[in-house]
Curated annotation (Swiss-Prot):
The keyword Ubl conjugation applies. GO terms for biological process: apoptotic process; determination of adult lifespan; mitochondrial outer membrane permeabilization; mitophagy; positive regulation of apoptotic process; regulation of cell cycle; regulation of programmed cell death. It is found in: Mitochondrion outer membrane. Residues 189-209 are annotated as: Required for initiation of apoptosis. This is NIP3 homolog. It comes from the Eukaryota. Homodimer; via transmembrane domain. Interacts with ced-3 and ced-9. Ubiquitinated and degraded by the proteasome. Under oxidative stress conditions, ubiquitinated at Lys-26 in a pink-1 dependent manner. Colocalizes with pdr-1 and may be ubiquitinated by it. PANTHER family: BNIP3, ISOFORM A, RE48077P. Residues 32-49 have a biased composition (Low complexity). GO terms for molecular function: protease binding; protein homodimerization activity.
Length: 221
């Protein structure tokens, strides 16, 4: 009996090895799907980790009723962009207005907005005169009220386009030109009237005499 067991022991060991090998293959096959499921779950979790790093994407929590877990991208809309652009334009316009309203000296900038015509006159006179001369008297003289005549005088004065036609002589020549008042009883008017009447009477009498003479001759024949 012992000899039989000793003889069969190697065979039994071989059978156990085969059984263990078969069971090991089964365990490997069962482990592989588990690894695949773990890899798929890891792949599913990686985009979530990437999404969390994006500040414009916020995940919906599981506490939201009636909705499954999803990702919503909060990109800036057109209305928000337009409103931001409008705000920037308003700020720029306000800055431009402030820069225009700020006082600007004549020496700093060539583009100066003068308040009145008197300041323009003063600046032109200062540019025309040589440096070093006092021009305060010119400013006082030009700013006096009597130097600016009223509108009625300016419209009636000679040389204005409102009173003289473009082809009229100069105002200085009026005193040398003969200018007389035209009336009905003037000597020239009466003389011309008489001369024209006498001439027309003579011409009419001559024409009438010629016509009458021809008629008389024709009647005698």
């Amino acid at each position: 009996m012992s000899s039989f067991l000793e003889f069969a022991k190697p065979k039994m060991l071989d059978i156990k090895r085969k059984i263990n090998f078969a069971s090991g293959e089964k365990t490997d096959e069962s482990v592989q799907p588990q690894q695949q499921t773990e890899q798929s779950s890891a792949q599913q979790t990686t985009p979530s980790a990437k999404a969390v790093s994006n500040p414009f994407i916020t995940p919906l929590t599981e506490s939201t009723p009636g909705m499954s877990e999803s990702w919503v991208e909060l990109a800036p809309s057109r209305t928000s962009l337009c409103s931001s652009v409008d705000i920037n334009m308003v700020i720029i316009d306000e800055k431009d207005k402030d820069s225009r309203l700020s006082p600007v000296s004549i020496a700093q900038s060539p583009h100066v907005e003068f308040e009145s015509l008197e300041q323009v006159k003063y600046k032109l006179v200062r540019e025309m005169l040589p440096p070093g001369k006092n021009t305060d008297w010119i400013w006082d003289w030009s700013s006096r009220p009597e130097n600016t005549p009223p509108k009625t005088v300016r419209m009636v004065q000679y040389g204005s386009n409102l009173t003289t036609p473009p082809n009229s002589p100069e105002p200085e020549l009026y005193q040398y030109l003969p200018c007389e008042s035209d009336s009905l009883f003037n000597v020239r008017v009466v003389f011309g009237f008489l001369v024209t009447n006498i001439f027309s009477f003579v011409v009419g009498a001559a024409v009438g005499f010629a016509v009458c003479r021809k008629l008389i001759k024709h009647h005698r024949q």
